[in-house]
From Swiss-Prot:
A lipid is attached at residue 315 (S-palmitoyl cysteine). Residues 1-37, 94-118, 184-191, 267-279 are extracellular. It is found in: Cell membrane. GO terms for biological process: adenylate cyclase-activating G protein-coupled receptor signaling pathway. Keywords: Cell membrane, G-protein coupled receptor, Glycoprotein, Lipoprotein, Membrane, Palmitate, Receptor, Transducer, Transmembrane, Transmembrane helix. The keyword Kinase does not apply. Interacts with MGRN1, but does not undergo MGRN1-mediated ubiquitination; this interaction competes with GNAS-binding and thus inhibits agonist-induced cAMP production. Interacts with OPN3; the interaction results in a decrease in MC1R-mediated cAMP signaling and ultimately a decrease in melanin production in melanocytes. This is Melanocyte-stimulating hormone receptor.
Amino acid sequence: MPMQGAQRKLLGSLNSTPTATSNLGLAANHTGAPCLEVSIPDGLFLSLGLVSLVENVLVVAAVAKNRNLHSSMYCFICCLALSDLLVSGSNMLETAVILLLETGALATRTSVVQQLHNTINVLTCSSMLCSLCFLGAIAVDRYISIFYALRYHSIMTLPRAQRAIAAIWVASVLSSTLFITYYDHAAVLLCLVVFFLAMLVLMAVLYVHMLARACQHAHGIIRLHKRQTPAHQGFGLRGAATLTILLGIFFLCWGPFFLHLTLVVFCPQHLTCSCIFKNFKVFLTLIICNTIIDPLIYAFRSQELRRTLKEVLLCSW
């Protein structure tokens, strides 16, 4: 039925190519090769999305409430929370609409479903791009605060941060509109993959350089106080562990999704790739998990923000 086809489109334009989908059916029929498909229950997916939604709403509310948090750094953190909020919210909306359509609780025309499909895809893609951009912006902000500490407040002024934020949002919306419109072109998917790799390299280079400077500074303090080297080694190990966790979480949560896009371009008809395509919802779930972890890494470690968060929660009761 036409409506059933429209319902399936809500699963996302980037899920797989038509060639890959049709070939998947042939592969199963002719070879019977087993595919490892991890099923993510809709209830679990929606629950994770709800946790992310609540967490990031609290971050946005705390930053908005406390004027002491209206600095460039917290503006970037707030925008990261807002983009993560949209990532989880758009995926929850898509899943909820699919469930309502499949159960017959929501009946509408195919054209309306198609428009909703396009809107959700643009919202999801733009919020994902924003999330990646603001992770990079936070890394740049921290880098400047360490290497240009005396000039930090003159470099990272609030108006400059606001202009950067506006540019990121506008560029993300325009780019996502083009990506969703031309999603069946290999160049578009490769652009997304290259963008992810660029953000990964940027964050790795900046944070490794910051770690090296911190270790150098700690070594200087130790030499000044004539302490033993194990303390310096312990600091270096802790810093390396923190850096590994930060970049590791980023790569593990985002990497599979962009690996999926890469395989769609290079091996849409291969049986192994077709099996990977069946786990698309797992990759989305990992991104949702990243939106849950981001506030723990970037926001809730701030004592000022935690104090404001307590005030927000107390005022809400």
